[in-house]
Amino acid sequence: MNKIHLLDEKTVNKIAAGEVVERPASIVKELVENSIDAGSKNITVEILEGGIPYIKVTDDGCGMNEIDAVLAFERHATSKIRSDEDLFNITTLGFRGEALASIAAVSKVVLQTKEENETFGTRLVVEGGKILEKTRCGCQKGTSVEVKDVFFNTPARRKFLKRPSTEAMYVTEVVTRLCLSNPGISFKYVKDKKVQFITSGNGSIEDVILRLFGKEVHSALIFSEFEAEDLKVKAFATKNFLNYSNRNMQFFYVNGRYVKNKTLSAAVDEAFKTYVPSDRYPGVFLYLEINPRFIDVNIHPSKLEVKFSDDRRIFESVYRTIREALRESNLIPEVKLEKDLKNEEGQIGEQVKLSLPLFEVKEKTDDGAIFVREEVKTEEKIDKAPKHESSSDSERNVKRLSDIRIVGTLFSTYVIVEKGDVFYIIDQHAAHERILYEKLVSQYERVQSRQVTFPIVVELQPGDMEIVGQERELLYKLGYVFEEFGNNSVVLREVPVILGQPEAKKLFVEIVERLRDKDFSSKVSFKEEEIATMACKAAVKAMDTLSENEIYKLFEDLKIAENPYTCPHGRPVIISMTKTQLEKMFKRIK
């Protein structure tokens, strides 16, 4: 008896459906993408209990005639491509022709559709991949698809679904991504019979962000764009002080398709390096338009992954666009003190809470910015950087310190500065750290070093001598000149000029340990990390008393820094507070 045999069509369809339909959110994604490809201007998504028992997607797209409606449930039946050549010029979201067939194979589907100017529409009832009913019906132009009892015939798949609230969260994520990629379409999202949001469809990405994420995110947006042959980049990002513990607020789109791509993530990380802490992530809404021939979306049925033919070009374009937005924006956070609006019995007036957790960061909108940019136009609603031009970064990034008065220092750590109706508090250590970091980075080929009076002997762990030998050039660029001294020791002849001998020896050991314990794919990135550490060790510390001349020198150096807002590790250098806020706290005004 033969051991190998062909599977029947029903079983094949169920197996294939497993790649396309992972959960209710997958169904919503496929149906909405079909609606978008149909030219819809209004799309409604409704779910009950996470979409497990019920999903409905309604659109006003082109609709289908009876023949096309039936063909749509056949595997690999599509209107998007006709030959393998078309795979290299894909402009639609769907193209495999598997969506409806896969959905119908594991659920109960009711489809109603009608083309424009047709008297009647078509209604199909499909269960487990079989068409049970085909009738004429009266309906509006467009298509509506109801999906019931997901995985009703594959109980093994159904039991692996999460609880309804979790599945609903996945659906919400999918609808959110689709809204952001299609600002010209009005989306209505209804969950458990409650409207969650409605987008206007007016074509504004900013408006979609406002409706989905609220004023806090919208008010913190910065924007820049880049355009070259066969490539356009638009980047909306939150200012550095509004950041998150994961990448969930990062949305990447290539030719209108939501994608995940390591090159894009790396470009964002590099652009925000030293602007946010290493374990925090900014919100980013990134849109790329590129010739379809230079990308490959036919990697996986989910179509979430994309490959670029020239990763380096994409990386540099995205990095440059976001970095431009950061350079041309006011990134000073404003401190806001929340008030306790609950008055205890017999107590008059409001109590102001001064505990640390009540400090929150808010966008600075006052015109009296301490760093005033010359020859840069700003808009009231959003900080927009100009398109990339041939002028140098230094010309576009000129900052000057004007009309300020140094009030004094607080706790021998913070410098207080007054300008107009705003006062600023500067962390002297973070400010000096930023200044030293940028100075050292500018000396990229060789950090300035000095000869030591007496040789410094450094004892290393077994095996570290091989690492030191391999990375001699990197250590030299960091300011170290050394010789081997016995089996597991080296003698330092020159050390970075900004460090004292004890710190220089300690840092050398730390660098070797990090080279041993981590696989650094980018030596440039590693060098920048070590320079940041070097700057931190050499900078003035908290409780170091500065003279008035030293404070002014700190400001003179800070005002010409490329990024005067954060230290190399992403901590804020400067925060602000307004006179109005202070007067409200003292009840001088309401």
From Swiss-Prot:
One of its GO terms (biological process) is mismatch repair. InterPro entries: DNA_mismatch_repair_CS, DNA_mismatch_repair_MutL, DNA_mismatch_S5_2-like, HATPase_C_sf, MutL/Mlh/PMS, MutL/Mlh/Pms-like, MutL_C, MutL_C_dimsub. One of its GO terms (molecular function) is ATP hydrolysis activity. Keywords: DNA damage, DNA repair. GO terms for cellular component: mismatch repair complex. PANTHER family: DNA MISMATCH REPAIR PROTEIN MLH, PMS, MUTL, DNA MISMATCH REPAIR PROTEIN MLH1. NCBIfam families: mutl. This protein is involved in the repair of mismatches in DNA. It is required for dam-dependent methyl-directed DNA mismatch repair. May act as a 'molecular matchmaker', a protein that promotes the formation of a stable complex between two or more DNA-binding proteins in an ATP-dependent manner without itself being part of a final effector complex. HAMAP family: DNA_mis_repair. Belongs to the DNA mismatch repair MutL/HexB family. This is DNA mismatch repair protein MutL.
